[in-house]
Regions:
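Small-residue-rich transmembrane alpha-helices and their cytosolic helix-loop interfaces
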Residues: 1, 59, 91, 95, ...
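Interfacial helix-cap and linker-helix signal at transmembrane-aqueous boundaries
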Residues: 1, 77-78, 108-109, 194-202
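C-terminal membrane-cytosol helix-exit motif in multi-pass small-molecule transporters
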Residues: 3-31
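Juxtamembrane intracellular "pre-TM" segments in multi-pass secondary transporters
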Residues: 26-54
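Extracytoplasmic gate region of multi-pass secondary transporters
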Residues: 47-107, 157, 191
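Cytoplasm-facing, short amphipathic helices at loop-to-helix transitions on the intracellular side
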Residues: 52, 114, 170-174
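C-terminal transmembrane helical hairpin of 12-TM major facilitator-type secondary transporters
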Residues: 68, 86, 92-98, 102-163
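A late C-terminal transmembrane helix in Major Facilitator Superfamily
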Residues: 154, 165-202
Length: 202
């Protein structure tokens, strides 16, 4: 707790640097004098933009999947006779390989089409889940599933934010990424709640 308190306290002096003048690119002079749109105007544009809606819905499913697996898979493994250590190692593998997957997704997003990469990512995630359910449950399949899902876990985030920036520009990235992330959290809620409800009913 002491270390955490020190790290949190460091935010105050570091935030002072945010008072520096905002950098303005040379080609931004033409747009600098345009009046900034408010939240309502941006929201109207976004809700009428079908690719943005589909992107948000995809992120909703992403939230459902990661929370459903993160919360309920360890209990599912225990119900099928595996030790709690197996579930712990699964989550550790997801967390470890998530670092690799997220970094790699961001790097690839700079070089290739972000929408296509995101499509492949969601597709591979779906196929991985189907394969896990179809194969016999063993320590090998559980750990392999953890590694692959870790690579695909939050690698959606840099690609999704990059697509939002490409759609509307970086000026409104924070606002619109927040809206997309809100749908992710809605999916997360249902992933946790419906999984527990199904367990209690069945």
């Amino acid at each position: 707790l002491l270390i955490t308190s020190v790290l949190v306290a460091l935010i105050v002096p570091l935030a002072w640097m945010l008072k520096a003048p905002m950098y303005q690119a040379p080609n931004a002079v033409a747009t600098a004098n345009k009046p900034a749109m408010g939240f309502k105007e941006i929201l109207v544009i976004a809700k009428n933009h079908k690719p943005f809606i589909w992107l948000a819905l995809g992120f909703l499913v992403c939230g459902f999947q990661v929370v459903f697996l993160g919360i309920h898979l360890p209990g599912y493994l225990t119900d099928h006779g595996f030790s709690t250590t197996t579930g712990t190692v699964f989550l550790a593998l997801v967390g470890l390989f998530n670092i690799v997957g997220t970094y790699t997704a961001g790097w690839l997003g700079d070089k290739y089409s972000k929408p296509k990469l995101l499509m492949w990512l969601y597709g591979l995630r779906g196929l991985t889940i189907i394969a896990f359910l179809a194969l016999p449950l063993s320590t090998w399949t559980i750990y392999s599933f953890g590694i692959i899902m870790g690579l695909l876990w939050l690698s959606t985030v840099p690609l999704t934010n990059g697509i939002v920036a490409n759609m509307f520009g970086v000026k409104y990235l924070t606002m619109l990424s927040g809206i997309v992330f809100f749908t992710h959290q809605i999916g997360s809620f249902f992933g946790g709640w419906l999984g527990g409800l199904n367990h209690d009913i069945t």
